[in-house]
Amino acid sequence: MTTVRIFFEKCGEAAYISLLDLQRVFHRMLKMSSLPVYYTQGFNPHIYLSFSCPLSLGQESLCESCEVKTEQESIEPQRWIDALQPLMPRGIVITKIAPAVEKVGEIETAAYEITMPASSAIALDAYNNAEHAEVTKKTKRGQ
């Protein structure tokens, strides 16, 4: 059994697909592709699928990843890409498939790029130059 890491972009309309819906998309696409994926051994078997560091709803990404276990000892990455990409919804593009070297929890860094209008530069500079920033936490009962 091999763990495969699928790298993909999630842009445009796909940025509004929630994590739970994204899991459903990948489950359906893996089933439709007939790739040799591993199913759990419980009463209701399902595909072993795990997403690493998912973004919030509405955020675009150029490098998301998920892991899926396969029944094979080795994989053909291009075969997987060719089988999955035509089934993906608009806005999700598979960029790379490779055997997972480390576990999802061992991923140490991520790079983020935030773009904002030029009119926000003054407010951003003021925030960055402030000695501290106060945040009011709101709970179900108020503040």
Model region roles, listed by residue range:
Residues 37, 48-143:
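Structured-RNA-binding interfaces characteristic of tRNA pseudouridine synthases
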Residues 1, 29-32, 88, 116:
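Detector for methionine-enriched segments
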Residues 3, 12, 17-65, 70:
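Glycine/small-residue-rich interface belts in oligomeric ring/scaffold proteins
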Residues 3-9, 112-116:
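Active-site-flanking beta-strand signature of metal-NTP-handling nucleotidyl enzymes
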